[in-house]
């Protein structure tokens, strides 16, 4: 659940984007080009490839039959700005250490000696690098998720520590839950060559599932801040 401080930040973003006071009343249907142009206008000018973002955002609205009202667009853009500043795969400082600390914590809970953990992480992974090297080089959740996918799938200790479940739980520009995406993938409009987890790390997938989580259900209230509070 969002904290009061974060809700205030999201409210401020709505004001800065010129979205304050917008209501979600159903407008007359608009041409795709008109909606995309509005998305580009509402996005911060510094964001690279705003046209590409607009295309993926519009496609997510259209595929889910969600009305692209100005309020709905503003709500989506506010969350993407707050969560990732419109980065498809945002970097996380100190991520490798965080991951190693979690591995050590789980190993301690399972009474696995540290030297065995270090030995398991010294095994070469499918990329040719050791798991320890890949952990140290990880800069984003996508990097870390790939490490854990391989570690859990190929090293027995990985399965012992994580039970087959990748501990990276969120992804994408809106930081949507991967579990949510996997549970709502039935109508996903794009071809999936790998897994839904991998799709959430793409711009199109991250925005599709993020928009589904934020707007893909009916509510009785009108203010977008209440949707922000529901988005977790």
Residue spans for each PLM region:
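Cell-wall glycan-active module
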Residues: 1-5, 14-232
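Flanking scaffold residues of small Cys/His-coordinated metal-binding clusters
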Residues: 11
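N-terminal basic, Ser/Thr-rich segments that initiate or prime the first beta/alpha elements at protein or domain
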Residues: 8
